[in-house]
Amino acid sequence: MKQIIFTDLDGTLLDSVTYSYEKSLAGINRLKQNDIPIIFCSAKTRAEQELYRRKMKVFHPFIVENGGAILLPSNYFPFSFGYRRIVDELLVIELGIPYNEVKKLVDKIKEEGGFHFRGFGDMSAEEVAKESGLDIESAKLAKQREYSETV
């Protein structure tokens, strides 16, 4: 029987305070040795997940922005399937709507509902870093939203 692991990143493979994955490496390496695919499924953006995929050397499909899209390496499966576009040699199956549409809707809800909040799209990378505890480079990656808005 083929096994596969779907996992979140924040607080699972990544320490929820330091964002370190050091404590997860032994398990990740054991899964790799046993040819068990590790599928990241996270609220993180494609840009954020690509950084961790490179660092951890995990090159399986991954799910971004809480299901906004599934990205697969172009030659991952030996069969064809429907996908919307190709980005950096990744096939993109889009399940969500584009960020600009999400942002318009969030802004409309905010305005018409009289709500007072800011999303990542309303903040600079410096503000995102300050509010989230991310370092500035991570905040820049977190702002590269394609399917969701963090408020």
Residue ranges of model-derived segments:
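Gly/Ser/Thr-rich helix-start
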Residues: 12, 65-69, 134
